[in-house]
Amino acid sequence: FFPFVINELAKLPSLISLLKK
């Protein structure tokens, strides 16, 4: 469970920076 959550949280900043571009 935790590895999956951490993986999803790690993806969020890159998705947000892509949207901000």
From Swiss-Prot:
Alphabetical UniProt keywords: Amidation, Antimicrobial, Secreted
Subcellular location: Secreted
Tissue: Expressed by the skin glands.
Biological function: Antimicrobial peptide.
Protein name: Brevinin-1OKb
GO CC terms, sorted: extracellular region
Keyword Secreted: yes
Principal localisation: secreted
Family from the record: Belongs to the frog skin active peptide (FSAP) family. Brevinin subfamily.
Domain of life of the organism encoding this protein: Eukaryota
Organism of derivation: Nidirana okinavana (Kampira Falls frog)
Modified-residue entries (Lysine amide), positions: 21
